[in-house]
Amino acid sequence: GATEAKMFAREGAKVVIGDVLEEEGRKTEAEINETGGECIFVRLDVTDEYLWENAVSEAVARFGKLDILVNNAGIFRTERVEETSGALWDQVMNINAKGVFLGTKAAIPEMRKAGGGSIINISSGLALVGSDRASAYGASKGAVRLFTKSTAIQYAAEGIRANSVHPGIIETPMTLPTILNTEERREQSADRHPLGRIGQPEDIAYGVLFLASDESSFMTGSELVIDGGLTAQ
């Protein structure tokens, strides 16, 4: 998320960062503003409908309109079906899937006022293929994939586009403590990709930037797979 925010700011976008991690969010906000960008941070728990409405209101109050939304909050868990508690299932679904729904719902009225917009939902390669683990995670990201398509169909006539992004294994704060936490696991993860490496946040950010831009104006309801060939096998 921080990489995307900085890249958007460099391209001239006015950026609103929403996160429960206030220290990290404020740090990114300061870095963008200190380098000539325009950015504000708002505290946002993506499972809270009121906080989504507040975040959208803050964006419009500060910058005049809202025409891009990137839903990229998420948690990653690797439990198999019998290892997954009901509480864990609900937590993963609430953050990864419900959060996307609430953000989209809150943003659409302002995008309508703006004359259109682009919604980019970060899904996963595990929304496209099955997994020997990550039961709740894969299900949540599959929900994001199909919710994106429904959003695209419902709002295309109003100039509001919606597309999903499907990363492979990316080196982020979410994966570093889990599937990339040892050198052996890093090598194994790299070897799973035909391109022979782990993805970097910039690999995803460039795709998100494209989907937010007018260059992708004929894309909606699509899946942008950025996974080093992982799901092509």
How does the language model describe each region?
Residues 129, 208-209, 220-233:
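Short C-terminal tail/terminal secondary-structure segment
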Residues 79-82, 129-135, 157-158, 196, ...:
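Active-site loop immediately N-terminal to the catalytic Tyr-X3-Lys motif
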Residues 124:
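Residue(s) in the substrate-gating loop at a strand-loop-helix junction
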Residues 109, 153-157, 217:
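Alpha-helical segment proximal to the catalytic Tyr-Lys
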Residues 104, 140, 148:
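Active-site helix of classical SDR
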Residues 80-81, 85-90, 185, 189:
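Substrate-binding pocket helix/loop in short-chain dehydrogenase/reductase
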Residues 1-16:
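Canonical Rossmann dinucleotide-binding motif of NAD(H)/NADP(H)-dependent dehydrogenases/reductases
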